[in-house]
């Protein structure tokens, strides 16, 4: 199976998982990226089964609206049963690295509100130790050099993602060469740097369920 076919399979598996638990008042949190796009397209086949969605990026909001799915502001929603999103890496504890698409801050906010965070990914994203994928950090623009110096002190090699401005008007530093053996601690350390909005470690609030597309089919993993 191609990578896109694996993504399509996990996206469909996520829809199959949440659909029986939705009703006409349900609002679904939806992530950002290529795998999340497959989820949106699969979910759209059942748009009468739920009320609408909260989007983690402008791009996701546009795709949802294109399918005729109502998109709500998070501030107007009292609860989210599910948040479904992809990841750049996951470990066996379902700690994630996200933010390859630069939507990490809004993704993290929506994930924090959701009762159940379902991560969907192809099998290549499951790794023994996080950090081979550079860790994205969203930064207030004027603090970019200061934050980069602090990230070097933490052992990383930050690279400015040129030409990228987040939906929040900020910039991204991608931190290379990190061996992330304690993701919860590192997430807190980076977020404590003045000028950091947030970073792409989802460890304080990891995924609850990982649906992994493999050549043998979709595997369902809960945190070890």
From Swiss-Prot:
Q: TM segments?
A: none
Annotated InterPro entries: NagB/RpiA_transferase-like, Ribose5P_isomerase_typA_subgr, Ribose5P_isomerase_type_A
Annotated GO biological process: D-ribose metabolic process; pentose-phosphate shunt, non-oxidative branch
List the catalytic residues. Answer: 107 (proton acceptor)
Reaction it catalyzes: aldehydo-D-ribose 5-phosphate = D-ribulose 5-phosphate
Record-listed substrate binding positions: 32-35, 85-88, 98-101, 125
Q: What metabolic or biological pathway is this protein involved in?
A: Carbohydrate degradation; pentose phosphate pathway; D-ribose 5-phosphate from D-ribulose 5-phosphate (non-oxidative stage): step 1/1
Instruction: Report the domain of life of the source organism.
Output: Bacteria
Q: Which UniProt keywords apply?
A: Isomerase
Stated EC number for the protein is 5.3.1.6
Q: Which GO terms describe its molecular function?
A: ribose-5-phosphate isomerase activity
Does this UniProt record's set of keywords contain Isomerase?
Answer: yes
UniProt keyword annotation of Ion transport present: no
Q: What does this protein do?
A: Catalyzes the reversible conversion of ribose-5-phosphate to ribulose 5-phosphate.
Query: Quaternary form?
Result: Homodimer.
Q: Supply the NCBIfam families for this chain.
A: PRK00702.1 (NF001924), rpiA (TIGR00021)
| Protein name as catalogued | Ribose-5-phosphate isomerase A
Organism, per UniProt? Pseudomonas putida (strain GB-1)
The gene from which this protein is expressed is rpiA
């Amino acid at each position: 199976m191609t990578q896109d076919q694996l993504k399509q399979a996990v996206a469909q598996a996520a829809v199959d998982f949440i659909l029986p638990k939705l009703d006409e008042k349900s609002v679904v949190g939806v992530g950002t990226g290529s795998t999340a796009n497959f989820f949106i397209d699969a979910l759209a086949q059942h748009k009468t089964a739920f009320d609408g969605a909260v989007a983690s990026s402008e791009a996701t909001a546009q795709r949802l609206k294109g399918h005729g799915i109502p998109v709500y502001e998070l501030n107007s929603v009292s609860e989210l049963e599910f948040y479904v999103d992809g990841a750049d890496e996951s470990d066996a504890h379902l700690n994630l690295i996200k933010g390859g698409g630069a939507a990490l801050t809004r993704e993290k906010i929506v994930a924090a509100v959701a009762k159940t965070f379902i991560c969907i990914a192809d099998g290549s994203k499951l790794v023994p130790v996080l950090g081979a994928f550079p860790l994205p950090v969203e930064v207030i623009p004027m603090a970019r050099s200061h934050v980069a110096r602090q990230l070097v002190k933490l052992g990383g090699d930050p690279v400015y993602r040129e030409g990228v401005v987040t939906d929040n008007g900020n910039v991204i530093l991608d931190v290379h060469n990190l061996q992330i053996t304690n993701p919860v601690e590192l997430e807190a350390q980076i977020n404590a740097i003045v000028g950091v909005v947030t970073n792409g470690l989802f460890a304080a609030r990891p995924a609850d369920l990982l649906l992994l597309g493999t050549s043998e089919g979709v595997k369902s993993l809960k945190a070890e």
